[in-house]
Amino acid sequence: MVSLEARVREVKGKREARRLRRSGEVPAVVYGPATEPIPVKIKRSVLEKIFHTISEATPIQLIIKDDQGNTVAEKTVFLKMVQRDKVSETVVHLDFYEPTKGHRMRINVPLKVVGKPVGVEKGGFLEVFHEEIPVETDPDKVPQEIEVDVSSLDLGDVIHARDLKLPEGVKCLLEEEEAVVSVLVPKEVAIEEATEEEEEAAEPEVIKRKEEEEE
């Protein structure tokens, strides 16, 4: 579990949010089924140290303090939403979700692809259609990642959502037939195979014509 410190944000509004960003802080909010929204602020320098290590499925111990540095609450939360500046792509606002025990939650879990497909050795290329898998789960059973082994995939093979191995109690929210990863056939190979099929189909017809002419 990752630990993160936040301070209570007493003043709200767009003007205050801009002021916080200029001073090196990121405005955020904590909420949940049994949690009234709590406006907080986080130092950007602290956030940047851990941001690349967390995902939506990472449990975070959020330590909330007042402006005097006194701890007012400690909560286990998940990063629900990240808002970025359209131009600079810097983080401008965060949403943290505090789940309630017994209340199932929907969350996106990173997909981890392992192995090198045999189809890639033959000239194909691996296409990952979903970098994250949406699931429904209990808060204490959130998987950190969903692993899929693609070693045995040949040209044209597909792993569907129904093929994913999930922990007990975790439900995939994709349609069963949804493609997750596949080894695609290169265009030139596909054209070559199609040409060969056409030639094979035409050959019997040519032989038949010759037989008719000889008769």
Swiss-Prot record:
InterPro entries: Rbsml_bL25/Gln-tRNA_synth_N (IPR020056), Ribosomal_bL25/Gln-tRNA_synth (IPR011035), Ribosomal_bL25_b-dom (IPR020057), Ribosomal_bL25_C (IPR037121), Ribosomal_bL25_long (IPR001021), Ribosomal_L25_dom (IPR029751), Ribosomal_uL5_bac-type (IPR020930)
Signal peptide: none
Pfam family, one: Ribosomal_TL5_C
Keywords: Ribonucleoprotein, Ribosomal protein, RNA-binding, rRNA-binding
GO biological process annotation, one example: translation
GO molecular function: 5S rRNA binding; structural constituent of ribosome
Biased composition (Basic and acidic residues): 205-215
Record's compositionally biased regions (Acidic residues): 192-203
Statement: the UniProt record of this protein carries the keyword Transferase: no
Top-level taxonomic group: Bacteria
GO cellular component: cytosolic large ribosomal subunit
UniProt cross-references to Gene3D superfamilies, sorted A to Z: Ribosomal protein L25, beta domain (2.170.120.20), Ribosomal Protein L25, Chain P (2.40.240.10)
Region (Disordered): 192-215
Function statement: This is one of the proteins that binds to the 5S RNA in the ribosome where it forms part of the central protuberance.
Subunit and partners: Part of the 50S ribosomal subunit; part of the 5S rRNA/L5/L18/L25 subcomplex. Contacts the 5S rRNA. Binds to the 5S rRNA independently of L5 and L18.
NCBIfam families named among the record's database cross-references: bL25_bact_ctc
Family affiliation: Belongs to the bacterial ribosomal protein bL25 family. CTC subfamily.
Annotated HAMAP family: Ribosomal_bL25_CTC (MF_01334)
Protein name: Large ribosomal subunit protein bL25
Organism name: Thermotoga sp. (strain RQ2)
Source species taxonomy: Bacteria, Thermotogati, Thermotogota, Thermotogae, Thermotogales
Originating gene: rplY
